[in-house]
């Protein structure tokens, strides 16, 4: 598939399953995280992996590919200084330096449209290596 076939302003479509899985994370808390990938044959963003509510941040980070781009949402639970339990949803655009330039371009041009489909995301992080999205970064952004 060439880039000429893509509308750069709209990017890829979004599979209904992707939207529904995000809503399950947001409303029902059945997932700790969801990792999405672009299916170039279907020309849409699809769910690649979900993590159960008991899965850790380390398990989430390990599930992201080392050399390829992905989108992810992570439901971050924390306790405020007032001792209140809170939860914030992070959208993470994972684009490691070692990924192919074509993949980086594809994910970059599709990000905004996909992100708009995910109503209820509190924060967005663009990460090129794990240190840009570690737990400390999430804590700082959430407080």
From Swiss-Prot:
Listed GO CC annotations: actin cytoskeleton
Alphabetical UniProt keywords: Actin-binding
An individual GO BP term: actin filament depolymerization
Domain ADF-H: 11-143
Name of this chain's protein: Actin-depolymerizing factor
Superkingdom to which the source organism belongs: Eukaryota
Pfam families associated with the record: Cofilin_ADF
SMART domains according to UniProt: ADF
Family statement drawn from the similarity comment of this UniProt entry: Belongs to the actin-binding proteins ADF family.
Any one GO molecular-function label of the UniProt entry: actin binding
InterPro entries the UniProt entry points to: ADF-H, ADF-H/Gelsolin-like_dom_sf, ADF/Cofilin
Described purpose of this protein according to its UniProt entry: Actin-depolymerizing protein. Severs actin filaments (F-actin) and binds to actin monomers.
């Amino acid at each position: 598939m060439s880039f000429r076939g893509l509308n750069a302003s709209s990017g890829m479509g979004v599979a209904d399953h992707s939207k529904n899985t995000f809503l399950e994370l947001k409303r029902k808390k059945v997932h700790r995280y969801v990792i999405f990938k672009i299916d170039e044959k279907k020309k849409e963003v699809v769910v690649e992996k979900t993590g159960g509510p008991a899965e850790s941040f380390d398990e989430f980070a390990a599930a992201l590919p080392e050399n390829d781009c992905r989108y992810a949402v992570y439901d971050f639970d924390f306790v405020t200084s007032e001792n209140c339990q809170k939860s914030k949803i992070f959208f993470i655009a994972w684009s490691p330096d070692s990924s192919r330039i074509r993949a980086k371009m594809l994910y970059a041009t599709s990000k905004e449209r996909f992100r708009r489909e995910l109503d209820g995301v509190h924060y967005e992080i663009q990460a090129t290596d794990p240190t840009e999205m570690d737990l400390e970064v999430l804590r700082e952004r959430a407080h």
